[in-house]
Amino acid sequence: MEAVLPTWIRRAPERKHDWASDLTPPITNGVIQQVVKLYAVNAIDEDILIFCDSDNAFIRPFDPRARLIREDKLALFYVEEDRPDLTLWRNVAALLLGLPAQSGARCNYVGNLIAWRRENIIALRRHVERTAGTSWVRAFVAHLLISEYVLYGRFVDELPGTQAAGHFHAAYDLVHGSWNNPMATETDIARFFDRITPGQVAVM
């Protein structure tokens, strides 16, 4: 990961779960992983980037063009949901984007198989820098609790606009996640797999 990070961020051997920073307090691994996604366009020339959670296990063939593209528009995972963590992430995104905190109410863009457009990532970073008056990285890592997916989603939906940014809202989740499913017994596990929908291609 160091290859795509700015030189003022480096591993801190003495701190297992944090990275050292010359410009900010220590940065958690989780925030660094998010920064790397936003930095990916520096190292990759593709127009579309697909982020797949490392815990995903594919159970069916996955054709990105068939599942993520519709009339040249790219799927943007979006469901309406209200949780305390989502409210916090939405408010942090609003701060970084210069948006009213209450706009984008109930939006959730977080998933385990997410696709972004390169040009939107670049535009998002530039917008954050204009709003924050500092580098987008420094503005981003100033927050311990933040979601890159919510930040990108709110930017796309509320600034250029979903269609103008080359996206369409997709309420289907391609990955059947275990976050909210008990997995303590064989019965729990069997129930988890029974709930997989025909359109889902992976489990997590």
Describe each model-derived feature in a short phrase.
Residues M1-N42:
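Active-site-proximal specificity loops/subdomain of glycosyltransferases
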Residues G30-V35, D55, L145-V150:
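Conserved glycosyltransferase catalytic-site signature
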Residues Q33-L76:
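GT-A fold catalytic core of metal-dependent nucleotide-sugar glycosyltransferases
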Residues Y39-A43, I50, A142-L144, F192-R195:
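A general structural signal for short secondary-structure junctions and capping/turn motifs
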Residues D55-I59, D63-R65, D82-R83, D157-L159, ...:
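Short, solvent-exposed loop/turn segments at secondary-structure junctions
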Residues I59-A139:
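Conserved catalytic core of nucleotide-sugar-dependent glycosyltransferases
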Residues Q102-R191:
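Catalytic core and acceptor-binding pocket of nucleotide-sugar-dependent glycosyltransferases
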Residues F193-M204:
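Extended C-terminal regions of large enzymes
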